[in-house]
Amino acid sequence: GFSVATLMACPSAEGLFQQAIPQSGACHHTLPQEASKKVTEHFLDELGLNSAVELEAASADDILIAQRATSAYFAQGAGQVNSLGVAVSPFYPVHGNATLPNDPLTAACNGASSTVRVLTGSNKDETTLWSTGETSREKLERTVAGYQAIEALAVYQCTRPEASSHDLLVALTTDHMFRIPAIRLAEARQEAAPTFMYQFNWRSRALNGALAATHSLEIPFAFNNLDQAGVDFFLGPGPSPQGLADTMHKAWCDFIKTGEPGWPAYDSDTRATMFFDDIYAVVEDPDPEERAAWNGIR
């Protein structure tokens, strides 16, 4: 999803596609030049090198070790470099150059890919893929502080009064990284070709249900290949959700062929969102208080 949204912001990609599906990821996921410089300097320091020329001679093993070390360094919040805070990925694409002049959201606001029809959305519990255990209150508050979203946490606590710290962390990180960027992309395209929004809510039964509607779970549904090796482990025990896969796959194919997935386009008035689950339906402006909590933050 991040890659598709980035391509939509690249002038050199203009005219190469008529439809785009930034799936589980949209805007907000590039680095500015100054952040990229910090990442590059740290990466080279890990290798004990000083230039790109020297890097070309480094072994693949050494590069991978340095990459992991650099990722860990920025994941700890040390040398924080962009608006993702403690969840930063240091190896995002870099904007502010000829290939990617602006970040994807600014590009969309300026009319980039305005003739391209877009289908975008996210899964309800994206970040359980990286966090299925217990979460301390301290970790929750530290993460939210990194997002500068303490007020948003208060809103989620009101809308989810029975939620544990772990549940709140999953909800907030999912929205910060996936749902809100997709919404911002759709909002930025109000005068462009239609944008359609979905949310995948079907819960995996694997690991006693701990994954819920996690990141990438929607992929075998969209491609209608639930029978592929390994997918059953991701789905968990129980009857096959083939009916949902048929429905979702048809929507994706219809959108690819015609630009229409089968539900109303997203706008700032109705915010129509297709919920994919055992029972699927269009919901207008889901979780409005939580969405509004990110205004001015994300």
Residue ranges: model-predicted function:
Residues 14, 19, 23-142, 169-174, ...:
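Substrate-access "cap/lid" subdomains that shape
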Residues 122, 149-191, 196-201:
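Alpha/beta-hydrolase fold catalytic core
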Residues 23-25, 167, 233-238:
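A short, mixed-charge helix-start or loop-turn motif at secondary-structure junctions
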